[in-house]
Amino acid sequence: MSKQPSLSYKDAGVDIDAGEALVERIKGVAKRTARPEVMGGLGGFGALCEIPAGYKQPVLVSGTDGVGTKLRLALNLNKHDSIGQDLVAMCVNDLVVCGAEPLFFLDYYATGKLNVDVAATVVTGIGAGCELAGCSLVGGETAEMPGMYEGEDYDLAGFCVGVVEKADIIDGSKVVTGDALIALPSSGPHSNGYSLIRKILEVSGTDIDNTQLDGKPLADLLMAPTRIYVKPLLQLIKQTGAVKAMAHITGGGLLDNIPRVLPKNAQAVVDVASWQRPVVFDFLQEKGNVDEHEMHRVLNCGVGMVICVAQDQVENALNVLRAEGEQPWVIGRIDVAAEGAAQVELHNLKAH
């Protein structure tokens, strides 16, 4: 008999019992998000989902994303309750821009050492995000990988599938000169630009724990969960049929995201003076001495979603969005793009 001690998975840094405890704690979270099309519960090898009734030519739409280095801020602040909503928002907001209704969501949670309380808090936030989006949390993967991550540090990824009627896909092809652009406000930086944000905080020596802006802690402003626009936008599409294009304003800001949904000959003219930029963006710009153009290329600057409709549908669209609890405004219009011109032109940029 060998004198070497008998090694277990736990000795290697993987606690199977902790993983099982987490699954038990999150079953209720998944149950609260259940849609009637989902077949079976958590724990199977694969999640089954029917196509919802009523679709003639259903097209499945998929997307995957993470939350970038906002996660590092969450870890530093030990604030894990809203990062799950961020994860869901980054995926479902991308799906809805083509008119898709999110059906189901899966998450991937990887860590060096599984902290069941932290993981359960994160997944509870994912569940809350799924409820806001009307999609079902059908499964996920929790990977405890000692040696890959420092201690209880973790990384997140999300994956979502939605469905849209083939004839109703929104792809920007109907956008024409004279169309109007409507904006929906963001809650803050959402889940993009956090490497720049963290660099600004570091270089400026900002004490994030003891800084307030307009009476609100800076930490809360930076960790505000990404808004989920799915339900108001699906209502807008359903009630008006007027949406020609939508852009989720993520990494790349207005400058890089609006062109993704425009025809090649179209230019979006955006009036930067049409909204009051949230104070957190002005604070970051000042502390980091960030160029105005760079601000709009990295951060959303207060705009989370841009919607294109015909000029004669503007009031109708604004009314529907307001009835859904949104605070929309007209942010610009569509012009013809001159040869070689950028597809987004920002008017009334402030001097910096």
From Swiss-Prot:
Pathway: Purine metabolism; IMP biosynthesis via de novo pathway; 5-amino-1-(5-phospho-D-ribosyl)imidazole from N(2)-formyl-N(1)-(5-phospho-D-ribosyl)glycinamide: step 2/2
Annotated CDD domains: PurM
Family matches, as InterPro entries: PurM-like_C_dom (IPR010918), PurM-like_C_sf (IPR036676), PurM-like_N (IPR016188), PurM-like_N_sf (IPR036921), PurM_cligase (IPR004733)
Catalytic activity of the protein: 2-formamido-N(1)-(5-O-phospho-beta-D-ribosyl)acetamidine + ATP = 5-amino-1-(5-phospho-beta-D-ribosyl)imidazole + ADP + phosphate + H(+)
Catalytic activity, EC: 6.3.3.1
CC annotations in GO: cytosol
Keyword Lipoprotein on entry: no
Keywords per UniProt: ATP-binding, Cytoplasm, Ligase, Nucleotide-binding, Purine biosynthesis
Keyword Translocase set for record: no
Gene Ontology terms for molecular function: ATP binding; phosphoribosylamine-glycine ligase activity; phosphoribosylformylglycinamidine cyclo-ligase activity
GO aspect biological process, one term: 'de novo' IMP biosynthetic process
PANTHER family reported in the protein's UniProt record: TRIFUNCTIONAL PURINE BIOSYNTHETIC PROTEIN ADENOSINE-3 (PTHR10520:SF12), TRIFUNCTIONAL PURINE BIOSYNTHETIC PROTEIN ADENOSINE-3-RELATED (PTHR10520)
Entry similarity comment: Belongs to the AIR synthase family.
Protein name: Phosphoribosylformylglycinamidine cyclo-ligase
Gene giving rise to this polypeptide: purM
